[in-house]
Amino acid sequence: MKKNHFLQELSISATQKRNGANNSKNDVLKIQSWLNLFELVNSGSGTLTSIDGDFGPATEKAVMNFQKAQGIIQNGVVDAAVFKLLCSPLQTAFETIPTGNGLRQRIINAGKLHVENFPHELIIKNKSNSGPWVRSYMDGLEGTDMFWCMGFVQAIIDQAASSLNKNFKDLMPSSFSCDVVGEEALAKGLLTRFAKVRDDPSVVKPGDIFLLQATPHDWTHTGIIVSVGNDVFETVEGNTNNDGSNNGDRACKRIRNFRKQKLDVFSIEPLV
């Protein structure tokens, strides 16, 4: 994969524990982030704690609650094995080789796999769009202005393309900007405007990318089309929510009515 920052999210430099001599603020931040992400999926697990880089009694107890949930020794210490359990959703999402007949099906399957592992942003140091999932999609970047929907899309396409020894950069520029990608699609003749999509939905194929149009040269959100119906696309999207926001807090599978929304479509056919 070309987008491989996720590898840095899968390990810590040394065992971390309360008052540990080898404690690293960066490692503790990772641990606290995953403890919070675990609680989002496992409500009531008791692993919510501050994300401040300090391995104090609260973090120790949160680790013990995580260890209890996993059925392992409850000592409050995070070694390599415990951290591997903490970050296992991200490892599963990024390191599972997509399967399927051809690139389009592999893109769809990779997208679904990521969503099933619940990619979710966190608020760290009062900044949204933060945490290990966001950094993985955004090549290490995070923070309030780091809208990560395009990073999510490109990570999925990269993962699927790499499984077939293809380079996603042959299709589109490596950019987190919907506008940059949209203009490239226009220049290559790969962008079908929403009006034509409404007239003839058959021009759209699963695995293609939608770009939500604000104006003809301004796009505010993106995602991968999983299936096409008469009126709707089923999609997988990052940085969204149940309302379809372009700055939500998670990746999810959605249904969008392309007859009511201005959804331009970027064809991935040249990479197929």
Per-range role (PLM):
Residues 33-34, 57, 61, 112-201:
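Secreted/periplasmic proteins that engage bacterial cell-wall peptidoglycan
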Residues 83-89:
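Short, basic amphipathic alpha-helical segments that act as recognition/interaction helices
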Residues 248-272:
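Low-complexity, Gly/Ser/Thr/Pro-rich intrinsically disordered linker/tail segments
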Residues 163-245:
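...with weaker cross-activation on analogous glycine-rich loops/strands in unrelated enzymes
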Residues 1-53, 93-105, 114-116:
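Acidic, Ser/Thr/Pro/Gly-enriched interdomain connector segments
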Residues 50-53, 76, 217:
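Acidic, glycine-anchored loop motifs typical of Ca2+
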Residues 63-66:
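Conserved hydrophobic/aromatic packing and binding residues within compact polymer-binding modules
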